Amino acid sequence: MKITSIDVFALKPRYMPQAMRGIVCRINTDTELYGYGEAAVSYGKGSMAGFHMIKELAPVILGQDPLRTEWLWERMFMDTFWGQSGGPIFYSAMSAIDIALMDIKGKAFGVPCYQLIGGKQRDRVRAYASQLQLGWPEDEARGLRIAVTPEDYAREAECALKEGYTAIKTDFTCVGPDGRMRDHDTMRGIVPKEMIDTACARLEATRKAVGPDVDIIVECHSHTDALSAVQYAQAIEKYGIYYFEEGTYPLNTDTAKNCARTVNIPMANGERIYTRWRYLPFLQDDSIQVVQPEIANCGGITECRKICDLAHIFDASVQIHVCGSPISLAAALQVEAAIPNFQIHENHVINKFLFTRELGKVDMAAVNGDFLIPEEPGIGQELSEYALQTAYHETVQ
């Protein structure tokens, strides 16, 4: 079997197309088999850079045997010069290709991808409702519902609980009391008491709404720094926080270590940390207790499994970061099924919407706060006809 061509798609969801533009590749072979993968640059800036980076990497794998996944991963890493110290665009493209290759491999052997990386440890995964500051509206909604007041935050948490979730994640600081996103400069250094008080009021209302047994994850998006993160985290310790996410930039292990040592809450980070080499120093100094590799930018299924094993050595648990199309969701579930140190699955509000789910051929939705592991060969997901017909598309052959 040989790789004959690669199709690259820039997806266009029915709603919010500028906010979430998923980048997906399909690797085709000289048989009936093909595989899908995703580059996790659908939000922020850089989605089309990821699109073209996949095209740049395509010649590395064209004409090769797609079942040689480890060898092809090393070729992309070693034979491209920039692969050995790439950033999000390079590693997102690499990840998309690796996921697609693993999808082909699973289909070739007639097994789900979890069988290729150790076998299944669980049939379903517990999920949390993610990013409630953006609302937790009905599946049919066409956009977000920004929370501002403490009552808003409590209401959105209650909406998630009604769907069966026993864990939620919210950024209590990014939205100011006027309903506008705070300027990043106001969230660094020693921050005003107003910001801490506003966040605590929202968190307290949320805790009262959900009760003592629901797990609350506090998100910071790395808008805070080592000073403001400690100031904020110490103020919220009393609310029983499950873990504290991206309190510091994912660039300096010393600041992350200081935050972890100073605060009595488990620390999580990783969606902007790529490959096992970048994770190693954070794990060596115990500055991250919950690693959050984004399967579609950390190096794909091949590398994500290695990151999870590395974390296991240091007693760190894993919550794979998921915020993209149904392709990366399916790939994440395959790894989460197989690893021993799984913590919880992220169900981002974007993935809840029907206008995201319809991009996949299989409708993958939470059931009472859990996700079932796909049992179809490969990753268990493909792009839908709607996604294929509406996407911008180029082919490399």
Describe every region a protein language model picked out.
Residues 28-109:
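Metal- or metallocofactor-binding catalytic centers and their adjacent structured scaffolds
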